[in-house]
Amino acid sequence: MTLEEQITHYRKQAGLSQEKMAEKIGVSRQAITKWENGTGTPDIANLMAIANLFQISVDELLSNEKSEKKQSNYIYESRTEYDIDGKKNFDIKLGGAYAVDLKAYHGEKIEVAMFSNVYKNLLADYKVKIDDIKNRIDIDLNRFNEASEADAKESLVITIFIPVKYIGKIELSVNAGTLNITDIENEHIEVNGKISEVTLQGNKSEIEIDSNLDMQISVLSHEGALEINQLSATSRLTLPADYRFRSTKKGIATHIYYERQGKKVDDFSDADADNYIEFNGIKSELVIVEAEV
């Protein structure tokens, strides 16, 4: 449950009306309403008052939001948070990284978490800059002290958490070995850069991937469009066995092939399916693979 759901749950469990709860912790009924519908967030003093009223810890009250952002097993880490007050488009520029996770979660803040088992000076060598410009948030990762992109590709792991209710369009630029995009529902996600492996799970979006490396793309679950743009590359796209999709190719000298149980087969796309795969580019090949059950 989200924080607002937790507050509602414990209030009802205690048999309290919003007005009665407000009296007990010394706030207005309107404050309780805002906390429960997600238009407001209690500060730390009020979180403590709520926890005390319901005889639970603040950690228990926040347990769901914390569980979505699991603790890392890395030696070094750095986290940057920023409060968001409404729906935003995101322009994210990361440069090089070993792995990047882009996730939606139930919370109020955007968080950029960096991990490494190598960088002792992670806090000094990498700085996250977040600019809030009207309806857009720019996130830039800057390197200092001669930290190189080559080093980042060897050992820097980045996880970006974006609040579910504030996600607009996303543009991500990154050069990474692996990229995971999870649980994002929005109009459009555009990915640019050099990426070797991509995993998509639980998304509802039009996802566009522009990369000229040979890629391994795994779709565990996805609703919407997937557009792949490549130049002189050969990539593989693995889909669940029961995944219905229609497909098309555009560009110059592009080809789509199909594979099942390790063998090339005829086109098994479905012209009536809602999910859509588009392959575009120049002198490139895409092999669509049906995952083995």
Role assignments for model-derived ranges:
Residues 27-41, 64-66:
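Recognition helix of helix-turn-helix/homeodomain-like DNA-binding domains
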Residues 13-14, 63-121, 150-154, 261-272:
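Short acidic/polar N-terminal linker immediately downstream of export determinants
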